[in-house]
């Protein structure tokens, strides 16, 4: 299975600084074991897995986070990194809010003056 995988430094405006997170853009919803194995291989504090809900990006994305050893309920920097990936790859227009459906509820990210909130 081919998967788009990005490494994003959150809370940084200079490469190789900030808090890194891996972000996987998924076409299908793989099983939990596969996501855990990817997170172990990335060996970052968190790896985010995004899959689009419905037929349009505006319908939101399912978002899950895994550490190298377990799934976690919430991760701020990997959420911001996920929004960055959606906007920079053109999956979602920059002026649109990114909506993430997570185990912790609905999370939303927007941009303001070049920063992700």
Regions found by a protein language model. Name each.
Residues 37, 59-62, 66-117:
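Acidic, low-complexity central loop/insert segments
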């Amino acid at each position: 299975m081919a998967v788009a995988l990005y490494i994003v430094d959150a809370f940084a405006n200079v490469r190789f600084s900030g808090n890194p997170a891996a972000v996987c853009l998924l076409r299908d919803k793989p099983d939990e074991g596969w996501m855990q194995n990817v997170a172990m291989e990335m060996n970052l504090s968190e790896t985010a897995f995004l899959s689009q809900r419905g037929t349009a990006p505006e319908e939101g994305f399912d978002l899950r986070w895994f550490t190298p050893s377990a799934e976690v309920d919430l991760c701020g920097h990997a959420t911001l990194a996920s929004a960055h990936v959606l906007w920079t790859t053109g999956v979602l227009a920059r002026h649109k809010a990114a909506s993430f459906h997570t185990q912790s509820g609905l999370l939303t990210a927007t941009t303001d003056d070049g920063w992700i909130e």
